[in-house]
Amino acid sequence: MTENQNPEQKARDNIDALLMQAGWAVQSAKKIDLNVGAGQAVREYQTDVGPADYVLFVDKKAVGVIEAKREEEGQRLTAHEPQTEGYAAARLKWVNNKAPLPFLYESTGIITRFTDARDPKPRSREVFCFHRPETLKEWLTQSASLRARLQHIPPLNLNHVPDKELR
């Protein structure tokens, strides 16, 4: 990083470092190689609504999008969720994506929020780091997201609970 960077460039440098720590190969949209590493984070990937800051690929399939914001936007990060959702729903160039991308992030490089769009009522939550490509790959093999599976937990059978536990 140099002193002459604007806040957006500094945020992207921080995001690049966080992605690399999580096992992502960070690439420019001008030089994409989907065979490098377990997952690729492609900067400025073209969509039909404009370039997304980052599109995440696992096994050569687009699985997520990251909307980068300058650090000063940290307290308003949730206000940018509709923009991220727009990129996730957009048609990607060079990729035949029929459904919206399931994994959405907004990040300043300091604060990162994550939404699993497969949840019954998707909402973002703050995370400490980006998920690893292997984690997203595993989640995609599951029939439903964790929050969706939690909705199908059987009710507690009170006949098997001791009386003193019910007080």
Residue map of PLM features:
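ATP-dependent helicase/translocase motor core
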Residues: 1-167
